[in-house]
C-alpha cells in the first residue's frame, strides 16, 4: 500500500514537471526577486573590476614617472617636462651643449644649488633646447658642486707637489753656477784669505799705535812745556811700524774694501 502511494506521488511530480510543449518542463530554482538581486551583484562586480583595471594602469604610470625620485630626499617631482615629454627611468639624461653652457653659467653666477622655484624656471628655459626635468637640473647642480669641492681640495696637493719638484730641480739649476774652473776658485780663496790676513795685521798695528799714543800722552802730561810734546812726536815718528802703516794707507790698492769718501777713525 505504501508502495502504491510512493508511485502515485512520483507520478504527480512528473505531471508537475510536464506540461508545456511536448511534455518537457523545467524546475524554477530562483524567484524573480532573487534573479534581480543577482543581476545587481553582477553589475557591481563588473564595475569593481573596471575600477581595479583603471587603478592598476594609474599605479603603473605613476611608478614609471617617479622612478627617478631620490630616496630619503624631500625634493621629488615626476620626471615630466613642461612640454609633456616623458623620460623613462632606464634612460640616462645627457645635457645638450647649449643646456650644459647655460647650466655652467648659472652655476658660476649663483651660490650652490638653486631653490625649487629657481629650478622650475631653469627647467622651463632648458626644455627649449632638449628633454630635461627638474630632477635632472637638481642632480646636475649637486654633482657639479661636489666636483668643485673635490677640485678645490686637490689644489693644495698640487701646489705641494710643484714645490717639491722645484726643490728637486734646484740643485741642477744651481750646478752650472758652480761649474767654474778650479784654478779660479783657488785664486779667489787665496785672495780672500790674503785680504783677511791684511785686515788682521792692520787691526793689530792700529791697536799697538793707539796704546803707544796713550802711553806717550801719560808721559807727556808728567813732563813740562813743549819739550815733552817734542819727545812724544819723536817717539812716535821714530817707530818703524809707523812708516809701514803710512805706506799701507797711501797705497790705494791695499784696502779695496774702503770706498772713496770714507774715513777711518784711528782714535
Swiss-Prot record:
Q: Which residues form a coiled coil?
A: none
Q: Superkingdom of this entry's organism?
A: Eukaryota
Protein localization: Nucleus
Q: Which InterPro entries match?
A: HD, Homeodomain-like_sf, WOX13-like
Q: Which PROSITE patterns match?
A: HOMEOBOX_2 (PS50071)
What family is it from?
Answer: Belongs to the WUS homeobox family.
Its name, as the record gives it, is: WUSCHEL-related homeobox 8
| Native source organism of the sequence | Oryza sativa subsp. japonica
Mind giving the lineage of the organism this protein is from?
Answer: Eukaryota, Viridiplantae, Streptophyta, Embryophyta, Tracheophyta
